[in-house]
Each structure stands twice: as C-alpha cells, then as structure tokens.
C-alpha cells in the first residue's frame, strides 16, 4: 500500500552555482560522508548535486514532512545497486521512523540538459 508520493525538479545551474559560491562547506549541509566521497569523483559536480538534492526533496515530500528533522538532507543518502538502480538509504532517527512505520522507498532519478528530476514512492513494506 502506498504511504506517500513525492517529486522534485531542480535546475542544475542552481546547485552548480551554490557549490561555486560556497565551496565544499555546502557539501556537509547536502550530502552524507559517502556522497561527499562520490562527489569528489563526479565529472559534473553541478549535475551530481542537483540529482541528489531532487531525490532528497522528493523523499521528504513522500514522507509528508518536508526537509526538517528527522528528514534532514545529511540523513538521506542516494546510492546505487550493482546494476545502477538508485537507492535511498536513511540514517539515524529517520531510519528509525521508516522502520517503525514499516516503510520502503522507491526512487527514480532523471536529468536532461538543464534539469534533474526525482520521483519517490514510499510504501508499507
């Protein structure tokens, strides 16, 4: 049964500009430590940030809380399975909320030229 659905679209230039203006200190506000390591290897830094930001925003909308505790940006990670499918991993208090509500997240991310978009479905597992 579906618990919530969320979607978000982000202009790649917006996140690229944020990183160019604020440098690496913005990474701690947006990314998990593993995502920061992945960011350092990314060919297109702005696109990397935009895709993750869109995914995290879409997740917070599906959860129904928006981005606020426990659904903070550094508590949500975008990873990939062996075939490249994007996966959401949650940490800390947010992971406990998902466990207690028996929720599982499904994520789709896409990007084209100027935009990144993400769609999240939260379902009762």
From Swiss-Prot:
The answer, when asked if Metal-binding is one of the entry's keywords, is yes
Cofactor(s) listed: Mg(2+)
What the entry lists under InterPro entries is as follows: 4-PPantetheinyl_Trfase_dom (IPR008278), 4-PPantetheinyl_Trfase_dom_sf (IPR037143), ACPS (IPR002582), Ppantetheine-prot_Trfase_dom (IPR004568)
Catalytic activity of the protein: apo-[ACP] + CoA = holo-[ACP] + adenosine 3',5'-bisphosphate + H(+)
Q: Could you tell me where this protein is found in the cell?
A: Cytoplasm
Keyword Metal-binding listed: yes
Q: What is its EC number?
A: 2.7.8.7
What EC class does the entry list?
Answer: transferase
One of the protein's GO biological processes: fatty acid biosynthetic process
SUPFAM superfamilies in alphabetical order: 4'-phosphopantetheinyl transferase (SSF56214)
**Keywords of the record:** Cytoplasm, Fatty acid biosynthesis, Fatty acid metabolism, Lipid biosynthesis, Lipid metabolism, Magnesium, Metal-binding, Transferase
An example molecular function term from Gene Ontology annotations: holo-[acyl-carrier-protein] synthase activity
Where Mg(2+) binds, per the record, is at 8, 57
Q: What is its main location?
A: cytoplasm
Family, as annotated: Belongs to the P-Pant transferase superfamily. AcpS family.
Tell me the function of this protein: Transfers the 4'-phosphopantetheine moiety from coenzyme A to a Ser of acyl-carrier-protein.
Q: What is this protein called in UniProt?
A: Holo-[acyl-carrier-protein] synthase
Q: Which organism is it from?
A: Dechloromonas aromatica (strain RCB)
